[in-house]
UniProtKB/Swiss-Prot annotation:
Subunit structure and binding partners: Component of the CSN complex, probably composed of CSN1, CSN2, CSN3, CSN4, CSN5 (CSN5A or CSN5B), CSN6 (CSN6A or CSN6B), CSN7 and CSN8. In the CSN complex, it probably interacts directly with CSN1 and CSN4. Interacts directly with CUL1 and CUL3A.
Source taxonomy: Eukaryota, Viridiplantae, Streptophyta, Embryophyta, Tracheophyta
GO biological process terms, semicolon-separated: protein catabolic process; protein deneddylation; red, far-red light phototransduction
Keywords for this protein: Cytoplasm, Developmental protein, Nucleus, Phytochrome signaling pathway, Signalosome
Gene name linked to the record: CSN2
Record protein name field: COP9 signalosome complex subunit 2
A Gene Ontology cellular-component term: nucleus
């Protein structure tokens, strides 16, 4: 006859086996349901609901089943049911599943919903608010921070800047000490917040705030940020310098942005390489960016090839070829609003280089001849010559009667053109005064 101890052992063994069998049944039910997701979504939903019911208490399989349920309801366009399932799923994150696993799953669902519902702002708002509330209750600060960042990025992508203000304040507050100063120990998080704010100021062209934040971001030394974040900060810095006509500083920032994006495997590297080429030409640099080892692998990239040819024509001072490349590569060059914004500056630089080279052997040269060589109207040639004389880059003056540039006698030339320039300014001022009085 078995002892009490033997009976107890037998009982425990029987109990363990029963639990294992139950776990196997739940697992089988989960995978059978998952197999029907694509072909029979309604049947899959019933199966996943059964998985949740089969678990005696909240655990992994129920969490996984609810995650699948959320995705199916979303695909079916049943957003009310989706939110109900998602809200139930979030009750598991306090203790039923590990923090790392719950973070991974929630991130996965957020990416899934955000990627498909960017136009459904009402759903996104409810979805993220539900997530944030659950994360606050679970005291998961790290995922709360990441979720708010994701929400900010969604609003940024669809131009909802006002919606971002409150979230950014909360994010910034979470990176501060009790005295209200920035906590340098949270340098990486601070940079992520700064990167979003910097993008807003770049888009809204608020250069004053952009400059302040840009310098604050570069001053943070305690962080090891993701290269994508530094790519964003440097790209926006480059655009800021371009707006201020600081071509050299812009080129430095675009190069840093390119390197960071390249390290992160981000496609923005191609755009920043284009911007680097643009800044290099505007600063009249003789250095070809594609000669460096970092940019060399992209020299023959289809998106970059037009810029490669453009800088080659620029360095050879071939204005007609330069303009031909611009016209025949509208999609890769001129369709970018940022590049297009500086094209007049760039064309003026190229024409200036060609003009200076053209007039070098002559003491007297006809404006019609220059016009033909530069492929621009004579009035544009005259304007360009006047600006170069006033800037002391050409030693000479214009004989407007005979349509010649006469080199030498720069003093009289500059005095004459300064007087004409002053006269033009006074005429504009007089015209404005008369208009304002009449109106």
């Amino acid at each position: 006859m078995a002892s009490d101890a033997d009976m107890e052992d037998y009982g425990f063994e029987y109990s363990d086996e029963e639990q294992e069998e139950q776990d196997v049944d739940i697992e089988n039910q989960y995978y059978n349901s998952k197999g029907m997701v694509e072909t029979e979504p309604e049947e899959a939903l019933s199966g996943f609901a059964e998985v949740v019911q089969m678990e005696p208490e909240k655990a992994d399989w129920g969490f996984k089943a609810l995650k699948q349920t959320v995705k199916i309801y979303y695909r079916l366009g049943k957003y009310k049911e989706m939110m109900e399932a998602y809200t139930e799923m979030l009750t598991y994150i306090k203790s039923a599943v590990t923090r790392n696993y719950s973070e991974k799953c929630i991130n996965n669902i957020m990416d899934f919903v955000s990627g498909s519902a960017s136009q459904n702002t009402g759903l996104l708002q409810e979805f993220y608010q539900t997530t944030l509330k659950a994360l606050e209750e679970a005291k998961n600060e790290r995922l709360w921070f990441k979720t708010n960042l994701k929400l900010c990025n969604i609003w940024f992508d669809i131009g909802e800047y006002r919606r971002m203000t409150k979230i950014l304040k909360e994010l910034h507050k979470s990176c501060q000490k009790e005295d209200g100063t920035d906590d340098q120990k949270k340098g990486s998080q601070l940079l992520e917040v700064y990167a979003i704010e910097i993008q807003i100021y770049t888009e809204t062209k608020d250069n004053k705030k952009l400059k302040q934040l840009y310098h604050k971001a570069l001053a943070i030394k305690s962080a090891i940020p993701h290269p994508r974040i530094m790519g964003i900060i440097r790209e926006c810095g480059g655009k800021m310098h371009m707006a201020e006509r600081q071509w050299e500083e812009a080129a430095t920032d675009f190069f840093e942005a390119f390197k960071n994006y390249d390290e992160a495997g981000n496609q923005r590297r191609i755009q920043c390489l284009k911007y680097l080429v643009l800044a290099n030409m505007l600063m009249e640099s003789e250095v070809n960016p594609f000669d460096g080892q970092e940019a060399k692998p992209y020299k023959n990239d289809p998106e970059i090839l037009a810029m490669t040819n453009l800088i080659a024509a620029y360095q050879r001072n071939e204005i007609i070829e330069f303009e031909r490349i611009l016209k025949s590569n509208r999609r890769t060059i001129m369709d970018d609003p940022f590049i297009r914004n500086y094209m007049e500056d760039l064309l003026k630089k190229v024409r200036t280089q060609v003009l200076l080279k053209l007039i070098k052997p002559y003491t007297k040269i006809g404006i019609p001849f220059i016009s033909k060589e530069l492929n621009v109207p004579e009035t544009d040639v005259t304007e360009l010559l006047v600006s170069l004389i006033l800037d002391s880059r050409i030693d000479g003056h214009i004989d407007e009667m005979n349509r010649y540039l006469l080199r030498g006698d720069s003093g009289n030339g500059r005095k004459l053109h300064k007087a004409v320039d002053k006269w033009n300014s006074q005429l504009k001022s007089l015209s404005s005064n008369i208009t304002s009085r009449v109106c």
